[in-house]
Curated annotation (Swiss-Prot):
Organism: Chlamydia trachomatis serovar L2 (strain ATCC VR-902B / DSM 19102 / 434/Bu)
Job description of the protein: Catalyzes the reversible transfer of the terminal phosphate group between ATP and AMP. Plays an important role in cellular energy homeostasis and in adenine nucleotide metabolism.
Binding residues annotated for AMP, in chain numbering: S36, R41, K62, L63, L64, G103, F104, P105, R106, Q110, R173, R184
Region (NMP): 35-64
Biological or metabolic pathway of the protein: Purine metabolism; AMP biosynthesis via salvage pathway; AMP from ADP: step 1/1
Superkingdom of source: Bacteria
Protein name as annotated: Adenylate kinase
Catalytic reaction(s) noted: AMP + ATP = 2 ADP
One GO BP: AMP salvage
Pfam families tied to this protein: ADK
Family, per entry: Belongs to the adenylate kinase family.
Record-level Gene Ontology MF annotations: adenylate kinase activity; ATP binding; metal ion binding
Length: 245
């Protein structure tokens, strides 16, 4: 029986629902949600050699090198992996040793670095692609509102003027304009297709239709992960289910 923990990577175009689905999966499956965006924002607020190196690039308006982004993500993954080993020695369930990574990798170089790490500790990891049309991306992002306090995302159809969770007035992101969105879509396609090709070759990719409503997309992901979840349930019961005829 394969007892390796569940590790998921979630990818998709801007507006595909990566953050929303990551949070739903983290809650439903007891996964640690690792967001590269959160890691970057956290690093910038600190005073460490790594954060200073990151700030030097950002202050100059330069893109962070693959190796530097990997340092940031690897630091968190290494911490998680060490904690996972301790939890597994305590015979905790698989779900308590599992995680979902959002916002990384963005390049083939990053994907290769990540694959090398995961192959050693989480060999059965999967990559979830939220596949969404350009039209749906435009529809979602041009009608999107953000809570500046909790980062909750809402749309015009919901009719909220303030966040229902923390009562803060909702705002529009400055980059949610048609011109910027079209540019982001094009950049995403150029950068991401080689990464998707890489994961397809590695037989890691699970493609989900993300044009559907949130809960329908979520259920599609769960259905696609059913084999992994069956392993999880069997690990938890510690029985000899495989010995049955």
């Amino acid at each position: 029986m394969d007892r390796s923990p569940l590790f998921l990577i979630i990818m998709g175009a801007p507006g595909s629902g990566k953050g929303t689905q990551s949070k739903l999966l983290a809650s439903q499956l007891s996964l640690l949600h690792i967001s590269s965006g959160d890691l970057l924002r956290g690093a910038v607020s600190k005073d460490t050699p790594l954060s200073q190196e990151i700030k030097s690039y950002l202050d100059q308006g330069k893109l962070l090198p693959d190796t530097l982004v990997w340092k940031l993500v690897h630091e968190k993954l290494d911490e998680f992996q060490q904690d996972t080993l301790l939890r597994r020695l305590s015979f905790l369930s698989r779900s308590e040793n599992s995680a979902i990574l959002d916002g990384f990798p963005r390049t083939v170089t990053q994907a290769k670095l990540l694959h090398e790490f995961l192959s050693s500790y989480f060999p059965n990891y999967k990559v979830i692609l939220l596949d969404i049309s350009d039209e749906e991306v435009l529809n979602r992002l041009t009608s999107r509102y953000i809570c500046p306090a909790c980062q909750g995302i809402y749309n015009e159809q919901q009719g909220f003027s303030s966040c229902p969770k923390c009562s803060v007035e909702l705002i529009r992101r400055s980059d949610d304009t048609l011109e910027v969105i079209l540019d982001r879509i094009q950049t995403y396609k150029q950068e991401t297709q080689p990464v998707l090709d890489y994961y397809t070759e590695k037989q890691k990719l699970i493609t989900i239709d993300a044009n559907a409503p949130t809960q329908q997309v979520f259920q599609s992901i769960l259905d696609s992960l059913s084999a992994s979840l069956v392993y999880q349930e069997r690990d938890c019961c510690n029985c000899d289910c495989d010995d049955e005829d």
